[in-house]
């Protein structure tokens, strides 16, 4: 711009210095000088026009660049704002993650404590189960021991079932009734043995008119051998009577032993039908002949184990072995019990 102003100043000086056109001489040298001056003026004017055009284009270009820069700047600001927002959200997430981590640690610690408590409780339960099993075994052993003792105490006893009751009964009258039974059914035994009775009575002791059947008579002999002789004689005779009416003679056993004998009832009847010659021996053992040998069984589980290797016998006793226990008395088809 300074050069252009200088040029304009120079041109103005030249114009002021040059004479007016009317005063110009018409010499060739003068005309040549005039032509050069006119060319310079034309050239400067063309330069000013072209430079202005370029400058305007340059300004427009720069304006567009500024607009683009502003747009880019706005985009950058927007990105920065979004980035800050994202960073803020990330910081919040980081804080939440830290809190969740702490909660997880707390929960893990509580879970570990619960697992320890559960493990301790399981150990206690297992110990209680072991103690319970041991206690059950001990109770079972005690019950078996008590049952054996009670059966041993009752071993000299004989139970008479179905003997009619009279209005007035006492020990002497009951002894006479027993003597009548022996004379009527076992006369040889009466001649051979001296029947010594320690005690004889009805059971239960109190009479009840509501009772449909006569109370049982319990006879306690001084020796076990006498009871066994009478039971053996009853088995041989098959039918025992008193004044022509049928009665039964059995061993006087504990309630548990009687129940164990009753549970053999269905199996006993099946084996008797198939001619296995079964017997119920003291206190509650089942015996029968299998493959030419006498087999003894103290409970059903022992019999189950035995028949697993004998398919025919297993099929024969399948239903009877799977029957549930019940307290219903099942007679052994008038087979005498010991």
Swiss-Prot record:
Biological process annotations from GO: retrotransposition
Effect of residue 261 to A: Loss of LINE-1 retrotransposition with decreased RNA-binding
PTMs per UniProt: Polyubiquitinated, probably by UBR2, which induces its degradation.
Effect upon mutating residue 114 to A: Small decrease in localization to stress granules
Leader sequence segment: none
Effect of mutating residue 210 to A: Loss of RNA-binding activity
GO cellular component: cytoplasm; cytoplasmic ribonucleoprotein granule; cytoplasmic stress granule; nucleolus; ribonucleoprotein complex
Compositional bias segments (type: Polar residues): 8-17, 26-35
Outcome when changing residue 142 to I: Loss of LINE-1 retrotransposition without effect on RNA-binding
Presence of the UniProt keyword Ubl conjugation in the record: yes
Location of region: C-terminal domain (CTD): 253-317
Principal subcellular localization: nucleus
Location(s) in or outside the cell: Nucleus, Nucleolus; Cytoplasm; Cytoplasm, Cytoplasmic ribonucleoprotein granule; Cytoplasm, Stress granule
Region annotation Disordered: where it falls in the sequence: 1-40
Coiled coil: 49-153
Keywords from the UniProt entry: Coiled coil, Cytoplasm, Nucleotide-binding, Nucleus, Ubl conjugation
Listed result of changing residue 132 to I: Loss of LINE-1 retrotransposition without affecting RNA-binding
Region (RNA recognition motif (RRM) domain): 157-252
One example GO MF annotation: identical protein binding
Keyword rRNA-binding: no
Assembly behavior: Homotrimer (via coiled coil domain). May also form larger homooligomers. May interact with DDX39A, HNRNPA1, SERBP1 and YBX1. Interacts with TEX19 and UBR2. Interacts with MOV10. Interacts with APOBEC3D; this interaction inhibits LINE-1 retrotransposition.
UniProt record similarity statement: Belongs to the transposase 22 family.
Domain notes: The coiled coil domain mediates homotrimerization. The RRM and the CTD domain are both required for proper RNA-binding activity.
Miscellaneous comment as given in the Swiss-Prot or TrEMBL entry: Long interspersed element-1/LINE-1/L1 retrotransposons are present in more than 500'000 full (6 kb) or truncated copies in the human genome. Most of them are inactive but 80 to 100 of those elements could be transcribed, translated and active in any individual. An active LINE-1 encodes for 2 proteins translated from a single RNA containing 2 non-overlapping ORFs, ORF1 and ORF2. ORF1p is described in this entry as a representative of all ORF1p potentially expressed by active elements. ORF2p is described in the related entry AC O00370.
Purpose of the protein: Nucleic acid-binding protein which is essential for retrotransposition of LINE-1 elements in the genome. Functions as a nucleic acid chaperone binding its own transcript and therefore preferentially mobilizing the transcript from which they are encoded.
The protein's name: LINE-1 retrotransposable element ORF1 protein
Protein's gene: L1RE1
């Amino acid at each position: 711009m300074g050069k252009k102003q200088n040029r304009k100043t120079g041109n103005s000086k030249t114009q002021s210095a040059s004479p007016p056109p009317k005063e110009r001489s018409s010499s060739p040298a003068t005309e040549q000088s005039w032509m050069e001056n006119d060319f310079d003026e034309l050239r400067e004017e063309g330069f000013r026009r072209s430079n202005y055009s370029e400058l305007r284009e340059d300004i427009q270009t720069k304006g567009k660049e500024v607009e683009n820069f502003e747009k880019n700047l706005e985009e950058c600001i927007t990105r920065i704002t979004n980035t800050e927002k994202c960073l803020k959200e990330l910081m919040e997430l980081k804080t939440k993650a830290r809190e969740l981590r702490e909660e997880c640690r707390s929960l893990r610690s509580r879970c570990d404590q619960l697992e320890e408590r559960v493990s301790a409780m399981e150990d206690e339960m297992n110990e209680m189960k072991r103690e319970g099993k041991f206690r059950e075994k001990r109770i079972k052993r005690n019950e078996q021991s008590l049952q054996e003792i009670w059966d041993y105490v009752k071993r000299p006893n004989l139970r008479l079932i179905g003997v009619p009751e009279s209005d007035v009964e006492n020990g002497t009258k009951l002894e006479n009734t027993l003597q009548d039974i022996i004379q009527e059914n076992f006369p040889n035994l009466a001649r051979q043995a001296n029947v010594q009775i320690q005690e004889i009575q009805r059971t239960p002791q109190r009479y009840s008119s509501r009772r449909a059947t006569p109370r049982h008579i319990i006879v306690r002999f001084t020796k076990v051998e006498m009871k066994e002789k009478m039971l053996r004689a009853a088995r041989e005779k098959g039918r025992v009577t008193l004044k022509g009416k049928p009665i039964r003679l059995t061993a006087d056993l504990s309630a548990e032993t009687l129940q164990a004998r009753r549970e053999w009832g269905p199996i006993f009847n099946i084996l008797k039908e198939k001619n296995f010659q079964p017997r119920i021996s003291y206190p509650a053992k089942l015996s029968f002949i299998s493959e030419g040998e006498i087999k003894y069984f103290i409970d059903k589980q022992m019999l189950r184990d035995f028949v697993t290797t004998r398919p025919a016998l297993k099929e024969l006793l399948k239903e009877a072995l799977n029957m549930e226990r019940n307290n219903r008395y099942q007679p052994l088809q008038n087979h005498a019990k010991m």
